[in-house]
UniProtKB/Swiss-Prot annotation:
Keywords: Host cytoplasm, Host nucleus, Host-virus interaction, Inhibition of host innate immune response by virus, Inhibition of host interferon signaling pathway by virus, Inhibition of host RIG-I by virus, Inhibition of host RLR pathway by virus, Interferon antiviral system evasion, RNA-binding, Viral immunoevasion. InterPro entries: Flu_C_NS1, Flu_C_NS2, NS1. The keyword Ribonucleoprotein does not apply. This is Non-structural protein 1. Pfam families: Flu_C_NS1 (PF03506), Flu_C_NS2 (PF03555). It is found in: Host cytoplasm; Host nucleus.
């Protein structure tokens, strides 16, 4: 097994432990799912003992380092509290320490960061494209990423948010909220896969299946074939998305 497998086990150990510390916030169904995740993670830990011996406590400690990004040698600007509107209600977002993550070679990342249409505010703007509600600002190859993971108090189900911001401006420029799922362990694994994919486009309650289809479309779109940023084309493209509407 690979080092990635060990890290994944450590992350799951940390998440399961932290969630069970908040049992009073969980309904019976969610608590049972987290207990099941903890049991399966302990089984994985025993399986890995032949090549990566460690205690449960060691796994939790390493998982916390991975989750919080403290193992990364990087300074992260402080994220300020914000809220996301979902179904007419504003839900708070609490930001964990940010991780610097490699962007990869997906052509969608080759466009520069641009200000919002008022020319001053660097904020995410909602667009409707290919059946998905998405938030996107252009990238100048400087994104950092934060993952926030906690039981949603309103639904007692796990929800995820990926928060993106530009190091040049130290302003939030996008976020992703993945749809709540009944299977917590499955949902967390999807969450990790989304991070590893290097694909960042924010959606509002859109399944990861649709997210992947948007990714495929973006890779095939000749517009994103530009190897150098073109601010005029970028602004025109963003404006066309806004005018297209839902």
């Amino acid at each position: 097994m690979s080092d990635k497998t060990v890290k994944s086990t450590n992350l799951m150990a940390f998440i399961a432990t932290k969630m069970l510390e908040r049992q009073e916030d969980l309904d019976t169904c969610t608590e049972m799912q987290v207990e099941k995740m903890k049991t399966s993670t302990k089984a994985r830990l025993r399986t890995e003992s032949s090549f990566a011996p460690r205690t449960w406590e060691d796994a939790i400690k390493d998982g916390e380092l991975l989750f919080n990004g403290t193992i990364l040698q990087a300074e992260s600007p402080t994220m300020t509290p914000a809220s996301v509107e979902m179904k007419g209600k504003k839900l708070p977002i609490d930001f964990a320490p940010s991780n610097i993550a490699p962007i990869g070679q997906n052509p969608i990342y080759l466009s520069p960061c641009i200000p919002n249409f008022d020319g001053n505010v660097w904020e995410a703007t909602m667009y409707h494209h290919r059946g998905a509600t998405l938030t996107k600002t252009m990238n100048c190859n400087c994104f950092q990423r934060t993952i926030w993971c906690h039981p949603n108090p309103s639904r007692m189900r796990l929800s995820y948010a990926f928060v993106l911001y530009c190091r040049n401006t130290k302003k939030i420029c996008g976020y992703l909220i993945a749809r709540q799922v009944a299977g917590i362990e499955t949902g967390i694994r999807k969450c990790f896969r989304c991070i590893k994919s290097g694909f960042v486009m924010a959606t509002d309650e859109i399944s990861l299946t649709i997210l992947q289809s948007i990714k495929s479309g973006a890779q095939l779109d000749p517009y994103w074939g530009n190897e150098t940023p073109d601010i005029d084309k970028t602004e025109a493209y963003m404006l066309s998305l806004r005018e297209a509407g839902p």
